[in-house]
């Protein structure tokens, strides 16, 4: 068996998504001394970097962060400063066009309604994709990405820090080992205080800040006048941009129950 593993070979063989982005091959020259050859690192472009994307990028710092893209440069200022050598963009399409040959993978943590288009275009370019939850804005988009993954053969992963945390596995093991007895009822809730829920669409129009490209944030969504209530978090409460509290938090609070109890699709859903 050959002990040589180039970056190209690594990319062709990997199927572990973003987890693969942090793998350090043992056979890299000097690996025993903690050295990793520059040619063996992945070049990563971050899209949607001010919020959750900032945390994801910090976990990828063993690789090369070569490009950063966000529609709100004021909100992303701390990340631009953290990676001063990375090229900066407002528009992910411009980034793909200008430096698509300079990166191997993307990290996408934009507003929900733009996940599918950003990820699909990256996959069509042969780029590996790590996309934050919710994977897409609709089931239809998710099915399209699934087919595209099979077609392109790139490594993909949906990011969900809640399901990746140690606590979920611990609770699952308790249940699987019978340590708390038979589970017959589960209650889950969220008040999601980081953004107020049930907001009405604002009627007032505000001046768009110079550091924000509102048209680029809207992307495929229907145009609406800018109001500062939407940024940087509250867009989640409008279907044009987000998926509401259910799409934002259910994957965190319900996932442990679904995994531990091996639940299937719901048979009944009630809303009020």
Report each predicted region and the residues it spans.
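NAD(P)-dependent dehydrogenases' Rossmann-like dinucleotide-binding region
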Residues: 48, 179-197, 212-227, 267-272
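Beta-strand-loop-alpha-helix segment that lines the small-molecule cofactor/substrate pocket
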Residues: 111-112, 116-164, 178
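Rossmann-like dinucleotide-binding domain that binds NAD(P)(H)
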Residues: 215-272
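N-terminal Rossmann-like dinucleotide-binding module
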Residues: 17-83, 162-165, 257
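N-terminal Rossmann-like NAD(P) cofactor-binding module of classical short-chain dehydrogenase/reductase
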Residues: 106-107
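Basic phosphate/pyrophosphate-binding loop/patch that engages nucleotide-derived ligands
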Residues: 147-154, 172-184, 200, 205-208
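Flexible glycine/proline-enriched surface loops and loop-helix/loop-strand junctions
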Residues: 152-154, 198-201, 234-243
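N-terminal secretory signal peptides and thylakoid transit peptides that target proteins
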Residues: 1-18
């Amino acid at each position: 068996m050959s002990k040589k593993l180039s970056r190209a070979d690594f990319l062709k063989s990997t199927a572990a998504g973003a987890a693969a982005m942090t793998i350090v091959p043992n056979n890299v020259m000097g690996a025993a001394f903690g050295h990793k050859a520059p040619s063996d690192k992945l070049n990563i472009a971050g899209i949607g970097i001010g919020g959750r994307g900032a945390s994801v990028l910090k976990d990828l710092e063993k690789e090369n962060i070569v490009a950063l893209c966000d529609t709100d440069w004021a909100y992303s200022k701390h990340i631009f400063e953290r990676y001063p050598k990375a090229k900066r963009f407002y528009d992910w399409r411009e980034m793909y066009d200008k430096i698509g040959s300079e990166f191997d993978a993307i990290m996408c943590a934009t507003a929900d309604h733009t996940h599918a288009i950003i990820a699909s275009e990256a996959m069509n370019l042969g780029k590996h994709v790590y996309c934050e939850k919710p994977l897409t804005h609709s089931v239809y988009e998710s099915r399209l990405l699934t087919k595209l993954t099979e077609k392109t053969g790139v490594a993909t992963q949906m990011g969900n820090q809640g399901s990746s945390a140690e606590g979920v596995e611990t609770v699952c093991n308790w249940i699987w080992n019978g340590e708390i007895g038979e589970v017959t009822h589960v209650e889950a809730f969220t008040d999601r205080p980081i953004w107020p829920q049930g907001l009405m669409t604002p009627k007032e129009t505000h001046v768009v800040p110079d550091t924000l490209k509102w048209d680029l944030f809207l992307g495929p969504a229907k145009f609406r006048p800018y109001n500062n209530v939407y940024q940087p978090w509250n867009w989640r409460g409008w279907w044009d941009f987000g998926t509401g509290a259910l799409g934002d938090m259910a994957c965190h609070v319900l996932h442990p129950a679904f995994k531990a109890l091996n639940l299937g699709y719901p048979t009944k859903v009630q809303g009020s």
